[in-house]
């Protein structure tokens, strides 16, 4: 009898347990570090009071959780605890949490709001990265440290309380936050690392930065709606690509402290029309203002010493150019494609005009080259300058690169100097208006296609020391080989075209 009663009691206990949990579908689990929780069938996560730590990756990729309640007993959340909880929409946070760790809510794509308490002092690396519906984060004013990628690709984030005590904004911290419209950098911030705000395409106003001394590359790259930018007052250099592709920017004022513009700093700022207070700039890097289509002028200081390659390439509206006397080289493609330039005076201090330096300046009519330091005009330096009419090459020049005046279709006359020993390949290629060129007495060779398609070149005298004429040198040009001197020892079969 006693045995029968015991069996009945056990049966009733089992039945009661099954009944209690079958209706509400709770999953009760006891986990490590004394954290007990339950997830209801409706997706509510309850963590029992008394637990202090949510372990690493405890709920990673859990698709059942929709709402999480984290009680005040919890003081620590370990990294990746809620990573990939793609259906999580709401979190009620413990007010005793001091850190949101690495990957904590990464890729929680349904999370739309996060309210933190002043107890939070650190937001770790990628803590909210990829939370694409997160539109508001509050309670962050006491945060002292942000991690890399902390809010990267939070594409709908519109409100964020910028921490007032953060010294460093790390790389990619807010990259891709396309819905942010304004940002004010706190006074405590002294460093902004690479691409911190890159791709914030809705950002219109960038203020603060007055104490920022170190700028990473590309910090505001592709913030293509930014119209108001306050530059830092404590740095001497604008970093590489820091404001490139800020397409809505029309005016920028350079503070007195900045002396160097880094490579591609303003490249692709298509509507940048005016650069104010550039008097202290001494160096401009590669492509710094390339593709600034609206830029009309740039005032160089007397202390300016260095251009980079393509510094002002494709500045279509640049009408006037006063090249500083403190430089010795105009680098490759420095002013190529500046189609509004009509007149150019190269200072006597310039030693080298590098490859394609003024290529495709299609409205350049007047070019003055001063004798003195200039020794080299390199390959394609003035190629495709279709409005250029006359050129005098100074006596100091002893090197012409290939295609220097290629496709200068309005070029009529060129005076070459006596120091030249060759006419390189394609020097006057397709100069269809060219009528007069003096070939200096020291020239020994005329290169391939040097005078190709020069149909107006009716009268050309060859020097007595000429030895070599390259392929197609005079093809489609009315120059007779009958006038060749006896000194010629090598002439390509098709030098004057094919019969």
Residue ranges and their predicted role:
Residues 57-63:
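Right-handed beta-helix
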Residues 1-3, 452, 497:
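Short intrinsically disordered, low-complexity coil segments enriched in acidic
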Residues 11-20:
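Bacterial N-terminal signal peptides
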Residues 7, 40-52, 63-76, 86-99, ...:
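Structural signature of tandem-repeat unit edges
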Residues 34-40:
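Short, exposed beta-strand/loop patches in secreted or surface proteins that constitute
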Residues 57, 78-81, 101-104, 124-129, ...:
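Consensus positions within tandem repeat domains that build extended binding/scaffold surfaces
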Residues 1-11:
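Bacterial N-terminal signal peptides that target proteins for export
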Residues 19-32:
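Sec-dependent signal peptide cleavage junction
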């Amino acid at each position: 009898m006693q045995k029968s009663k015991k069996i009945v009691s056990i049966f009733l206990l089992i039945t009661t347990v099954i009944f209690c949990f079958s209706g509400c579908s709770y999953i009760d689990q006891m986990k490590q570090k004394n954290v007990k929780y339950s997830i209801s069938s409706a997706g509510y996560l309850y963590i029992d009071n008394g637990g202090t730590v949510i372990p690493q990756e405890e709920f990673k990729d859990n698709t059942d959780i929709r709402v999480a309640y984290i009680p005040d007993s919890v003081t620590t959340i370990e990294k990746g605890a809620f990573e990939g909880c793609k259906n999580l929409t709401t979190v009620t946070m413990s007010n005793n949490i001091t850190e949101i760790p690495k990957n904590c809510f990464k890729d929680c794509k349904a999370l739309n709001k996060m309210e933190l308490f002043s107890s939070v002092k650190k937001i770790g690396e990628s803590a909210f990265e990829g939370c694409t519906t997160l539109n508001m984060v509050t309670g962050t004013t006491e945060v002292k440290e942000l991690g890399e990628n902390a809010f990267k690709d939070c594409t709908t984030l519109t409100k964020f309380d910028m921490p007032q005590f953060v010294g460093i904004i790390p790389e990619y911290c807010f990259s891709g936050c396309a819905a942010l419209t304004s940002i004010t950098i706190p006074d405590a911030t002294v460093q902004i690392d690479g691409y911190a705000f890159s791709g914030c395409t809705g950002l219109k106003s960038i203020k603060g930065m007055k104490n920022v001394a170190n700028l990473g590359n590309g910090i505001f790259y592709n913030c293509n709606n930014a119209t108001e930018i306050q530059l830092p007052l404590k740095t001497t250099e604008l970093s590489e690509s820091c404001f490139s592709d800020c397409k809505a920017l029309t005016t920028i004022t350079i503070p007195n402290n900045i002396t160097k513009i880094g490579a591609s700093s303003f490249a692709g700022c298509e509507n940048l029309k005016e650069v104010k207070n550039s008097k202290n700039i001494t160096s401009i890097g590669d492509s710094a203002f390339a593709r600034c289509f609206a830029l009309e002028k740039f005032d160089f200081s007397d202390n300016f010493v260095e251009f980079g390659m393509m510094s002002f390439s494709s500045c279509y509206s640049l009408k006037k150019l006063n090249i500083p006397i403190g430089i010795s080289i105009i680098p490759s493609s420095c002013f190529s494609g500046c189609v509004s330039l009509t007149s150019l005076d190269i200072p006597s201090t310039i030693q080298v005009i590098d490859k394609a330096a003024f290529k495709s300046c299609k409205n350049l009519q007047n070019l003055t080259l001063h004798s003195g330091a200039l020794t080299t005009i390199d390959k394609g330096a003035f190629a495709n300058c279709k409005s250029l009419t006359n050129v005098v090459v100074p006596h100091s020049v002893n090197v012409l690169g290939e295609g220097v005046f290629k496709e200068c279709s309005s070029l009529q006359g060129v005076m070459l100097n006596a120091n030249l020993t060759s006419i390189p390949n394609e020097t006057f290629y397709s100069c269809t208006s060219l009528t007069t060129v003096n070939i200096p007495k020291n020239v020994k060779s005329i290169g391939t296609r040097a005078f190709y398609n020069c149909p107006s070149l009716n009268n050309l005298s060859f020097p007595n020391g000429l030895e070599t004429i390259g392929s197609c040198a005079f093809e489609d040009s009315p120059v007779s080989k009958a006038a060749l001197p006896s000194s010629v020892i090598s002439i390509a079969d098709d030098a004057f075209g094919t019969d």
